[in-house]
């Protein structure tokens, strides 16, 4: 697998990673690519074992012949794919979706408010997220926590003001305030699983929902 980043000479066109489309859209393209590559691997393995393609099955680290239990490793298949082979072990897949199933999130926050100064301290923040079946629960939790921090910062701290000459007064992070971990109190994130049939392995998006929820909360 060769991944080229930030080189427009060799990278294919991509419209960008935004609008909660990375896991939901790109993930399905990855699923399609893997399924097609698995077919190619089985075709090459069947040729190596001298049988029909429908007589073999993909078994993770190898391909197994169903009737004799003979196996051929992915290492041998990869070598065959590069030497004297007519089946390319590579594929390019795309994916679009006519639907965009929404994720859901509940945010509950306990604050301490100084009625005289208006200062708000976050004591507890509880979030429950339905993003389908999380592909990577740890990363989904981290993204949720990061989004909550961003949302709280956007709501309570971040602001752009201008001086009388029209120049931004916030020229660095010394003036433009963003929250730190000490500003967050206790964060707790739970997931309510639901299976989304149009997403990769039942997943939905999670990007924007975790940032948008803290403001109303």
Model-predicted segments: where are they?
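C-terminal catalytic domains of large/alpha subunits in multi-subunit enzymes
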Residues: 2-217
């Amino acid at each position: 697998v060769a991944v080229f980043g930030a080189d427009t000479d060799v990278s294919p066109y991509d419209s960008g990673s935004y609008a909660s489309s990375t896991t939901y859209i790109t993930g399905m393209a990855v699923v399609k690519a893997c399924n097609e590559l698995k077919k190619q691997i089985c075709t090459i393995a069947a040729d190596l074992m001298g049988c029909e393609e429908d007589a073999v099955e993909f078994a993770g680290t190898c391909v197994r012949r169903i009737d004799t239990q003979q196996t051929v490793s992915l290492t041998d298949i990869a070598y065959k794919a590069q030497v004297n082979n007519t089946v390319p072990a590579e594929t390019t897949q795309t994916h679009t979706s006519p639907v965009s199933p929404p994720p859901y999130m509940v945010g509950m926050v306990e604050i301490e408010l100084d009625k005289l100064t208006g200062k708000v301290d976050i004591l507890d923040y509880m979030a429950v997220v339905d993003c389908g079946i999380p592909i990577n629960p740890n990363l989904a939790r981290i993204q949720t926590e990061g989004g909550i921090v961003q949302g709280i910062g956007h709501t309570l701290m971040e602001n752009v003001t201008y001086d009388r000459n029209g120049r931004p007064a916030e020229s660095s992070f010394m003036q433009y305030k963003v929250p730190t971990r000490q500003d967050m109190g206790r964060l707790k994130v739970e997931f309510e699983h639901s299976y989304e049939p149009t997403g990769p392995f039942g997943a939905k998006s999670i990007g924007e929902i975790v940032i948008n929820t803290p403001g109303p909360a």
